[in-house]
Protein backbone atom coordinates (compact mmCIF):
# COMPACT_ATOMS: atom_id res chain seq x y z
CA UNK A 1 0.00 0.00 0.00
CA UNK A 2 1.43 3.37 -1.01
CA UNK A 3 0.58 6.96 -0.08
CA UNK A 4 -2.02 7.29 -2.83
CA UNK A 5 -3.74 4.08 -1.66
CA UNK A 6 -3.91 5.49 1.88
CA UNK A 7 -5.31 8.81 0.63
CA UNK A 8 -7.91 6.89 -1.38
CA UNK A 9 -9.08 5.20 1.84
CA UNK A 10 -9.44 8.66 3.42
CA UNK A 11 -11.20 10.07 0.34
CA UNK A 12 -13.54 7.09 0.20
CA UNK A 13 -14.59 7.73 3.79
CA UNK A 14 -15.00 11.50 3.24
CA UNK A 15 -12.09 12.00 5.63
CA UNK A 16 -9.76 14.17 3.54
CA UNK A 17 -10.99 17.67 4.32
CA UNK A 18 -9.95 21.12 3.14
CA UNK A 19 -10.51 24.42 4.94
CA UNK A 20 -8.82 26.00 7.98
CA UNK A 21 -8.17 23.62 10.85
CA UNK A 22 -6.45 23.82 14.21
CA UNK A 23 -4.63 20.51 14.59
CA UNK A 24 -4.04 18.62 17.83
CA UNK A 25 -0.53 20.12 17.78
CA UNK A 26 -2.05 23.63 17.90
CA UNK A 27 -0.77 24.37 14.39
CA UNK A 28 -3.12 25.59 11.65
CA UNK A 29 -3.46 23.74 8.34
CA UNK A 30 -5.55 23.90 5.15
CA UNK A 31 -5.86 20.08 5.20
CA UNK A 32 -7.32 17.82 7.88
CA UNK A 33 -7.34 14.04 7.89
CA UNK A 34 -10.47 13.09 9.85
CA UNK A 35 -9.24 9.62 10.73
CA UNK A 36 -12.32 8.73 12.79
CA UNK A 37 -14.34 8.73 9.56
CA UNK A 38 -11.94 6.07 8.24
CA UNK A 39 -11.75 4.04 11.46
CA UNK A 40 -15.54 3.67 11.63
CA UNK A 41 -15.20 1.21 8.74
CA UNK A 42 -13.64 -2.11 9.79
CA UNK A 43 -12.68 -3.02 6.21
CA UNK A 44 -10.78 0.24 5.63
CA UNK A 45 -9.14 0.03 9.05
CA UNK A 46 -8.12 -3.57 8.44
CA UNK A 47 -6.51 -2.76 5.07
CA UNK A 48 -4.55 0.17 6.50
CA UNK A 49 -3.40 -1.59 9.65
CA UNK A 50 -2.51 -4.85 7.90
CA UNK A 51 -0.26 -2.84 5.57
CA UNK A 52 1.23 -0.94 8.53
CA UNK A 53 1.92 -4.23 10.34
CA UNK A 54 3.77 -5.48 7.26
CA UNK A 55 5.89 -2.30 7.18
CA UNK A 56 6.71 -2.66 10.88
CA UNK A 57 7.76 -6.29 10.41
CA UNK A 58 9.86 -5.36 7.38
CA UNK A 59 11.58 -2.57 9.34
CA UNK A 60 12.26 -4.24 12.70
CA UNK A 61 11.12 -7.86 12.60
CA UNK A 62 8.70 -9.23 15.19
CA UNK A 63 7.42 -7.15 18.09
CA UNK A 64 5.95 -8.31 21.38
CA UNK A 65 3.54 -5.48 22.13
CA UNK A 66 1.90 -2.44 20.52
CA UNK A 67 1.42 0.62 22.72
CA UNK A 68 -0.64 3.58 21.52
CA UNK A 69 -1.61 7.00 22.84
CA UNK A 70 -5.28 7.45 23.76
CA UNK A 71 -7.56 8.47 22.18
CA UNK A 72 -6.63 8.52 18.51
CA UNK A 73 -4.10 5.71 18.57
CA UNK A 74 -6.27 3.07 20.23
CA UNK A 75 -8.07 1.74 17.13
CA UNK A 76 -5.04 1.61 14.79
CA UNK A 77 -2.89 0.26 17.62
CA UNK A 78 -5.30 -2.57 18.32
CA UNK A 79 -5.86 -3.48 14.68
CA UNK A 80 -2.14 -3.31 13.86
CA UNK A 81 -1.40 -5.55 16.86
CA UNK A 82 -3.96 -8.04 15.58
CA UNK A 83 -2.02 -8.35 12.32
CA UNK A 84 1.30 -8.52 14.18
CA UNK A 85 -0.07 -11.27 16.42
CA UNK A 86 0.69 -9.44 19.65
CA UNK A 87 -1.24 -7.68 22.43
CA UNK A 88 -2.17 -4.01 22.32
CA UNK A 89 -2.32 -1.58 25.25
CA UNK A 90 -2.55 2.18 25.44
CA UNK A 91 -1.38 5.08 27.55
CA UNK A 92 -3.72 7.81 28.77
CA UNK A 93 -3.19 11.34 29.97
CA UNK A 94 -3.21 11.74 33.72
CA UNK A 95 -2.16 15.10 35.09
CA UNK A 96 -1.14 16.15 31.58
CA UNK A 97 1.26 13.20 31.08
CA UNK A 98 0.82 9.88 29.33
CA UNK A 99 0.83 6.92 31.73
CA UNK A 100 -0.02 3.25 31.65
CA UNK A 101 -3.28 2.72 33.53
CA UNK A 102 -6.06 0.12 33.77
CA UNK A 103 -3.66 -2.59 35.04
CA UNK A 104 -1.72 -2.50 31.74
CA UNK A 105 1.94 -3.40 32.07
CA UNK A 106 4.96 -3.81 29.85
CA UNK A 107 6.80 -7.15 30.09
CA UNK A 108 10.51 -6.82 30.79
CA UNK A 109 12.56 -6.97 27.59
CA UNK A 110 9.51 -6.67 25.31
CA UNK A 111 10.12 -5.28 21.83
CA UNK A 112 7.52 -2.54 21.48
CA UNK A 113 5.95 -0.81 18.51
CA UNK A 114 4.44 2.55 19.43
CA UNK A 115 1.49 2.83 17.02
CA UNK A 116 -0.16 6.17 16.30
CA UNK A 117 -2.81 7.36 13.88
CA UNK A 118 -1.42 10.57 12.37
CA UNK A 119 1.85 12.35 13.16
CA UNK A 120 2.26 16.08 12.55
CA UNK A 121 5.02 17.30 14.88
CA UNK A 122 5.63 14.01 16.67
CA UNK A 123 4.86 15.48 20.11
CA UNK A 124 2.14 13.00 21.16
CA UNK A 125 4.19 10.13 19.77
CA UNK A 126 7.30 11.34 21.61
CA UNK A 127 5.33 11.66 24.85
CA UNK A 128 4.00 8.13 24.34
CA UNK A 129 7.51 6.77 23.66
CA UNK A 130 8.77 8.51 26.83
CA UNK A 131 5.94 6.97 28.89
CA UNK A 132 6.78 3.52 27.52
CA UNK A 133 10.46 3.94 28.36
CA UNK A 134 9.59 5.26 31.82
CA UNK A 135 7.60 2.04 32.34
CA UNK A 136 10.67 0.01 31.33
CA UNK A 137 9.78 -0.63 27.69
CA UNK A 138 12.11 -1.03 24.72
CA UNK A 139 10.58 0.96 21.84
CA UNK A 140 12.02 -0.48 18.62
CA UNK A 141 9.81 1.52 16.26
CA UNK A 142 7.27 4.34 16.16
CA UNK A 143 4.66 3.69 13.49
CA UNK A 144 1.76 5.68 12.08
CA UNK A 145 -0.84 5.51 9.36
CA UNK A 146 0.07 9.00 8.08
CA UNK A 147 3.13 11.16 8.71
CA UNK A 148 1.98 14.58 7.56
CA UNK A 149 5.33 16.21 8.44
CA UNK A 150 7.10 15.03 5.29
CA UNK A 151 9.53 13.04 7.44
CA UNK A 152 10.50 15.94 9.73
CA UNK A 153 8.65 14.74 12.86
CA UNK A 154 10.75 13.31 15.68
CA UNK A 155 8.76 10.75 17.68
CA UNK A 156 11.78 9.69 19.72
CA UNK A 157 12.20 6.35 17.88
CA UNK A 158 12.69 5.33 14.24
CA UNK A 159 9.47 6.29 12.40
CA UNK A 160 7.68 3.96 9.98
CA UNK A 161 4.75 5.56 8.15
CA UNK A 162 2.26 3.92 5.82
CA UNK A 163 1.90 7.28 4.03
CA UNK A 164 4.15 10.30 4.14
CA UNK A 165 2.78 13.71 3.18
CA UNK A 166 4.23 17.19 3.34
CA UNK A 167 1.16 19.15 4.42
CA UNK A 168 1.68 22.77 5.45
CA UNK A 169 1.06 23.61 9.10
CA UNK A 170 1.54 27.06 10.61
CA UNK A 171 1.73 28.68 14.03
CA UNK A 172 -1.28 30.95 14.64
CA UNK A 173 0.83 34.10 14.27
CA UNK A 174 2.30 33.03 10.89
CA UNK A 175 -0.79 32.20 8.84
CA UNK A 176 -0.72 32.99 5.12
CA UNK A 177 -3.47 35.51 4.25
CA UNK A 178 -5.49 32.99 2.21
CA UNK A 179 -5.69 30.61 5.20
CA UNK A 180 -6.38 33.41 7.70
CA UNK A 181 -9.42 34.43 5.60
CA UNK A 182 -11.12 31.04 6.14
CA UNK A 183 -13.14 30.43 9.35
CA UNK A 184 -11.35 28.11 11.79
CA UNK A 185 -12.48 24.58 12.66
CA UNK A 186 -10.95 22.88 15.72
CA UNK A 187 -11.48 19.12 15.35
CA UNK A 188 -8.42 18.05 17.42
CA UNK A 189 -8.45 15.99 20.61
CA UNK A 190 -5.11 16.88 22.19
CA UNK A 191 -6.65 19.62 24.29
CA UNK A 192 -8.98 17.10 25.95
CA UNK A 193 -7.97 16.82 29.58
CA UNK A 194 -7.92 13.49 31.32
UniProtKB/Swiss-Prot annotation:
Gene3D superfamilies noted in UniProt: 3.40.50.2020
Its EC number(s): 2.4.2.10
Residues holding 5-phospho-alpha-D-ribose 1-diphosphate: 116-124
Segments passing through the bilayer: none
List of residues binding orotate: 120, 148
GO biological process: 'de novo' UMP biosynthetic process; pyrimidine nucleobase biosynthetic process
Involved pathway(s): Pyrimidine metabolism; UMP biosynthesis via de novo pathway; UMP from orotate: step 1/2
Ribosomal protein among keywords: no
Domain of life: Bacteria
Cofactor requirements of the protein: Mg(2+)
InterPro entries registered for this protein in UniProt: OPRT, Orotate_PRibTrfase_bac, PRibTrfase_dom, PRTase-like
Keyword flag tRNA-binding: no
Keywords of the record: Glycosyltransferase, Magnesium, Pyrimidine biosynthesis, Transferase
Catalytic activities: orotidine 5'-phosphate + diphosphate = orotate + 5-phospho-alpha-D-ribose 1-diphosphate
Entry's Gene Ontology molecular function annotations: magnesium ion binding; orotate phosphoribosyltransferase activity
Subunit structure: Homodimer.
Family recorded in the similarity comment: Belongs to the purine/pyrimidine phosphoribosyltransferase family. PyrE subfamily.
PANTHER family for the chain: OROTATE PHOSPHORIBOSYLTRANSFERASE, URIDINE 5'-MONOPHOSPHATE SYNTHASE
HAMAP family: PyrE (MF_01208)
Function: Catalyzes the transfer of a ribosyl phosphate group from 5-phosphoribose 1-diphosphate to orotate, leading to the formation of orotidine monophosphate (OMP).
Protein's recorded name: Orotate phosphoribosyltransferase
Lineage, highest ranks first: Bacteria, Pseudomonadati, Pseudomonadota, Alphaproteobacteria, Caulobacterales
Gene for this chain: pyrE
Amino acid sequence: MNTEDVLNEFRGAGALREGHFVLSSGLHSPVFLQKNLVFQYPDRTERLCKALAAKITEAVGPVDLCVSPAVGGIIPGYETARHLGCPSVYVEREGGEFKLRRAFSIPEGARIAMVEDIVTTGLSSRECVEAIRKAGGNVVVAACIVDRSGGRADPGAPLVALARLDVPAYPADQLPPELAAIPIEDPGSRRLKG
